[in-house]
Amino acid sequence: MTKQDKDVRAYQQLSTGSFSDPFSFLGPAIDKDQGILRVWVPGAESVYLLVEQERVELEHESYSGFILKQYAPLNEQYYRLAADFSGSEQILDDPYQFHNIYAEYDELHDPKEMYRHMGAQPMTLTRGDECISGVRFLVLAPHASACSLVGDFNQWDDLSLPMQRLDYGIWGLFLPNISAGEKYGFQLKGPRGERLPFKVDPWSFHASLSPHFLSVTFDHSGYQWQDEAWQTREIEPICKQAISIYEVHLGSWMPTQDESISVYRHLADTLAPYVAEMGYTHIEIMPLAEWVDDTGVGQCPVSFFAPTSRYGSPDEFKHFIDCCHQANIGVILAWVAGHFTPHEQGLVEFDGTTLYHHPDPRIGQDQDCHLYFFDYSREHIRRYLVANALFWLEQFHVDGLRVDGVASMLCLDDSRSHEQWQHNIDGGNRNYDASALLKWLNEEVHKCYPRAITIAEDIRMLQGVSEPTFMGGLGFNFHWQVDWVRSSLHFMAALCTEREESLIDMIEPLTSLIGEHSIYPICHDEIAYGRGSLLNQMAGEGKDKLANYRVYFGYVYGLPTKKMHFMGCEFGQNDEWCPSKAMLWQLCNSEAHQGLDILVSDLNKLYRSQAALHELDCDPSGFQWLANEDRYELILAYSRQSSGDDYVLVICNFSMHYYSESQIGVAYEGVYQLLLNTDAACYHGDQGWVSESVESTYMSGEHFDHSVTVSIPPLSCLYYRLI
């Protein structure tokens, strides 16, 4: 093929958006010691070179191509173009003069570095003596035959900016003189040259939802953090910390009517101080990676590196987290790593192949929920997900990640009939590749961010989830105990006269989980999807329902586990949660709901102030049953203790009976002082009589040598501390 034939073919490919090697054809070059400049400007009638003080017209060559021959070499000079479009002249930059857009291997494959190089990265390149600012675009599409950059900067013309195929299946291009706020995306052609749907950037840091879903360039270097005191504070080992988490859906917590202020900024001024005043230690935010469906709650992300723009900008989200930290509140982000949406602009069939999901639908798809599962057997996917986790921790200073749907990641048969799933190599249901990913994820997070907390949402009680990786576990700090919550709520839903048979629901899960690294999650799932509000899951009517609510919370806050509940539970929201509706804050005007609110606040503060209630949550020595055998009295009592001398009794009466002299065995003799009574008048209780302090007496028993005799009102929980 002659050079002329090659030129003709190149122009033909440029004109159809099929050219994969524009650096070999466009831009400045040298031919026989003479400078040549070839540019591609679709729609232009004439093009001029602007360099230093000169203006030189280029010759039209073919299609939309223009060439300048026998000119001084331009290899080291920065130049611009003046193009005439039907009498209107525009000054353009030629991106094909910037060939130095490559990144090193480690920068493109090390999860700690990838998010600093992939996607749209603001940077400055040198051209001759000039430093030119702009944005470099890199996207992985190894099976694509061509890739074009489109955006505001080229009027979404999918022919004007063909990207260069680089190494490792990556396509790249540098656009000079553009900055943050430019909307963009990619137009790709598949392996057979077929035109693919428009794609957003898998690494985009910002997105626009209206009127179309698009990626947006963003510079993460501009925000000035004010949380140094939080980041450098002294802390206990994670398992010994008091952790009380307030789970929040940002869009429905307390919507603002002021459209001039973003949700993120509104919540920085309202949610952060509220959570601090209530005594919580952390906020857990439901998934925030950008999603498309306004009826969803973030469980089906499209842009994994972009906090949803429906609530504000990335910097405004940083401001929200900054304010939380300044209020001494940690922020945990619910993080989706198991699946992605089938939205055609997202990851699905990104380069015309199953680049991100498994080709076998029994492994790669959920036909019922219309989701795609990541193929964890592929190295580029594991790197992408680990890089994403590190990105949220680094760029947004989040204090932890709660990994969504761990059971569905690990179990090939999760929510599937027999014919819908594929066995692993050993004939079992464990997804070994997902296990490898989660181990690596936790190792990288704990190595790079030792203060960060990782939590597994595990509804199947899988073994080893919170064991260290060196012991064969997955390495999470904590895992959810959803079955424990549901069994205890089953007990609380029964009338007091029918609770004898289900008391085991309160005892057995706790007994089997003592010493586990667990969280008791009264999460959004438990008060939605037809289950009803938490308050309405309690037995009884009126005052009895409220009393059941109070004794339940008293029981939960003493358990040897970290705490979490969903927004609205603190004041007894009586409607099932709906993400499109605000919480019923007007309930707080009633004394009954005020009482619940005060109780939860006091429980948070008690839990944090008493080392016995949190220090040994993950150690079997921190918990002991004191009374759990009389199913007719419906009294459960246990002790909590610290590594020092702190010793607290938690005594719960789940019956309608008042016990004036209930004898409870204790491990230590001495005087026990009342810390909290859920039946107190300040919590809108009946203020049944209880002793402010009790002194132990000697008893000859099988388990204890000492006991205390206490009065316990109906449906109440008492906390006593050894003084």
For each predicted feature, which ranges?
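Hydrophobic residues within beta-strands of alpha/beta enzymes
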Residues: 47, 147, 283-285, 401-403, ...
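Short, flexible loop/turn elements at secondary-structure junctions
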Residues: 141-143, 153, 167, 177, ...
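Substrate-binding/active-site clefts of carbohydrate-active enzymes
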Residues: 204-208, 228-240, 249-430, 694
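Short glycine-biased active-site loop of nucleotidyltransferases that positions the nucleotide triphosphate
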Residues: 59, 293-298, 342-349, 466-467, ...
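Carbohydrate-interacting/catalytic domains
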Residues: 1-241, 264-279, 543-546, 557-565, ...
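Non-transmembrane alpha-helical segments in soluble domains
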Residues: 272, 321, 389-393, 442, ...
